Amino acid sequence: MSSQPKLRILCLHGYRQCDQSFRQKTGSTRKLVKSLAEFEFVNGVHSVAVDEHVDSSRAWWFSNNEAMSFSSRESTEVAVGFEESVAAVVKFIEENGPFDGLLGFSQGASMVHLLIAKAQLGEIKLPGIRFAIFFSGFLSLSSKHDSLTLLRIKEFPSMHVFGDADEIVARPKSEKMADMFDVEPLRIAHDGGHVVPSMSKHKEKIAGFMREQLDRKIENN
């Protein structure tokens, strides 16, 4: 008897996090859908100079090329290290895939959006990836990404989770990202801040979204 198929989802952490810390932060959410999905975690390419003795603070790119720092509120003309991160994620997918979807938090969510846009423009390949999940997502404010952030994302189901009390990525910023997807997104608001919240209140919604994506996977196979 063959085992029940599951989704494989690649997860991208936020700024000043790492793969292992993000694994811990998503534990409760992953547990809710463990019968439907398996999750893998990729580490950011760039170290953040917070503490010279700590290697667990990572970034996907920097918005300030002097301080080598990042702010989601900072309009900038640079995206230092972005292309290296794109190449690293694409390589990770090639070597560890196939994956069915991407999941990101904060800067990781923005990175997921940019990867999808690059794939839709034909600049990179994301084989097998058909959906995305965003926690505290936002559109990059770097002018380097204008061609990507202005692109309508077509035929790509997505789920967007945002906090009404998020003071780092305000809800309207996450809603603006969701608006860029032509397929009507699933939007879930919580009353917390800049976190991956407990999703137990929304178990039926997230499980329903996952089941839809799993059904699509089975149909396409």
From Swiss-Prot:
UniProt keyword annotations, A-Z: Hydrolase
Active site, renumbered: 106 (charge relay system), 166 (charge relay system), 194 (charge relay system)
InterPro entries in the record: AB_hydrolase_fold (IPR029058), FSH-like_dom (IPR005645), LovG (IPR050593)
Molecular-function annotations in GO: hydrolase activity
Source taxon at top rank: Eukaryota
Disulphide-bridged cysteine pairs: none
Cellular compartments per GO CC: cytoplasm; nucleus
Enzyme class: hydrolase
EC number(s) reported in the record: 3.1.2.-
Protein family (similarity comment): Belongs to the LovG family.
Protein name in UniProt: Esterase C25G4.2
Organism: Caenorhabditis elegans
Phylogenetic lineage: Eukaryota, Metazoa, Ecdysozoa, Nematoda, Chromadorea
